């Protein structure tokens, strides 16, 4: 018996090497195909968000169903730097170089063998949109050159661009509804979004086919009010509009423009300075008596052009169609400064990723803030003081209230979810447009079905 075992062992080691699939037949071959298929259609995406106040990197990992996979303990790698690309208007090469630390971080996250197949995109938002002349294009070209020469990622010809406000709003709508698990459901089950950035504010929500069909036509060259997007096989009609010059930082300039030679009723007693935005300077002087809530509110209403002629049945401000309202707007998610300002003024705990907010809550906080003088505001709101914007706390709070109630027509008591992050499975994702952009980038890869595309 011992001799027989030795003979069998000898024969086994003497046989030519064979693969496990050959040896075990179709069973292992089938399971190996499944493994390879999962590996092949799992993919990373890298998105740069070049905003008006800073640049951010987002890295995502998707499976074949377009679900997020873990990167470490979370489902998103994220980091940011300041200042934004628009700060390098006169030095485009330095603008591109400023992104290299973020690029290197992304390269550390994505496995080396997957980097050539990983799409990378950069979307520049309102900050670059507001630059004069060809300054923005020079910066973008420098970034293209840097990525092509320096990066091992998949850089497509259209990978680096200025994304317009409607794209920004559309991508954010996808991000929020993706994270909440609403994609593939009826439009009435989706959530509308409002994003108050630095240079612009966007609103996006799904509407009925009837509303979309009857949407007003726009002038040549203007963005249409309705964007059609297919997500997981379900077509959605999105009302999207971006209001350039009405982001948090840009709106201050619009408000101060109205008082070039006189004090501004939105500024706190004891403040006298110059506000600089997008290369322009604006006088910022307070009345000796300080801010006046009602006068400030009226000044902001003028800045929003609420009395501008409305050629449609219903408008927001500046003669812009409001999208008709409806169930797609019934539930709203507000992001960016709609979260950061309440956070910085103590309306919410800093560790909270999102919370319920009503416009009337902002109004109440505004009345408190406007009663302070500049020195008291600095001590009351240390986070704003650290950012050197405590002088504008009254203005910013009233602006948000007027924007929501008078601009977008919301009830002062309407409950809105305001957040910087959204729970996704056992992790969180940032409530921002890059995830929606990444979903589109992944869907464009040949190995994925077209799970998301704009019509």
UniProtKB/Swiss-Prot annotation:
Q: Name one GO molecular function term.
A: ribonucleoside triphosphate phosphatase activity
What is annotated as the active site?
168 (proton acceptor)
Localization, per the record, is: Nucleus
Q: Which domain of life is it from?
A: Eukaryota
- State the similarity comment: Belongs to the GDA1/CD39 NTPase family.
What function is annotated for this protein? Answer: Might be involved in RNA transport out of nuclei.
The molecule here is called Nucleoside-triphosphatase
State the species of origin.
Pisum sativum (Garden pea)
């Amino acid at each position: 018996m011992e001799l027989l075992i030795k003979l069998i062992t000898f024969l086994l080691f003497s046989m030519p090497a064979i693969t496990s699939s050959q040896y075990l037949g179709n069973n292992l071959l089938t399971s190996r195909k499944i493994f390879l298929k999962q590996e092949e259609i799992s993919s990373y995406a890298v998105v740069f968000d070049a905003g008006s106040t800073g640049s951010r990197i987002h890295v995502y990992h998707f499976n074949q169903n377009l679900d997020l996979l873990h990167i470490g303990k979370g489902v998103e790698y994220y980091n940011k730097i300041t200042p934004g690309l628009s700060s390098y208007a006169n030095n485009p090469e330095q603008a591109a170089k400023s992104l290299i630390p973020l690029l290197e971080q992304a390269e550390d996250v994505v496995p080396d063998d997957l980097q050539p197949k990983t799409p990378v995109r950069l979307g520049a938002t309102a900050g670059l949109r507001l630059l004069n002349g060809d300054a923005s294009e020079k910066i973008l070209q420098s970034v293209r050159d840097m990525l092509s020469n320096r990066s091992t990622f998949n850089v497509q010809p259209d990978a680096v661009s200025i994304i317009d406000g409607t794209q920004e709003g559309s991508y954010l709508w996808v991000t929020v509804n993706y994270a909440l698990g609403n994609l593939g459901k009826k439009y009435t089950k989706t959530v509308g979004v409002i994003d108050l950035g630095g240079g612009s504010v966007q609103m996006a929500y799904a509407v009925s086919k009837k509303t979309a069909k009857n949407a007003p036509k726009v002038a040549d060259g203007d963005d249409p009010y309705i964007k059609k997007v297919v997500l997981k096989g379900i077509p959605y009609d999105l009302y999207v509009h971006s209001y350039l010059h009405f982001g948090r930082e840009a709106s201050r300039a619009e408000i101060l423009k109205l008082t070039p030679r006189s004090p501004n009723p939105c500024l706190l007693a004891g403040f006298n300075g110059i506000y600089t935005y997008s290369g322009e300077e604006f006088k910022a002087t307070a009345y000796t008596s300080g801010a006046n809530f009602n006068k400030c509110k009226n000044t902001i209403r003028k800045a929003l052009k609420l009395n501008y002629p409305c050629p449609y049945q219903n408008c927001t401000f500046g003669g812009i169609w409001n999208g008709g309202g409806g169930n797609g707007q019934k539930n709203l998610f507000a992001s960016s400064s709609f979260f950061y300002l309440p956070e910085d003024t103590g309306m919410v705990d800093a560790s909270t990723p999102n919370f319920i907010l009503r416009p009337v809550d902002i109004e109440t906080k505004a009345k408190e803030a406007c009663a302070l003088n500049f020195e008291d505001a600095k001590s009351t709101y240390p986070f704003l003081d650290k950012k050197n914007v405590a002088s504008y706390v009254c203005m910013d709070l009233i602006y948000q209230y007027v924007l929501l109630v008078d601009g977008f027509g919301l009830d002062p008591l309407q409950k809105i979810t305001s957040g910087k992050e959204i729970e996704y499975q056992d992790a969180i994702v940032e409530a921002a447009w890059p995830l929606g952009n990444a979903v589109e980038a992944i869907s464009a890869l040949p190995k994925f079905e077209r799970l998301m595309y704009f019509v």
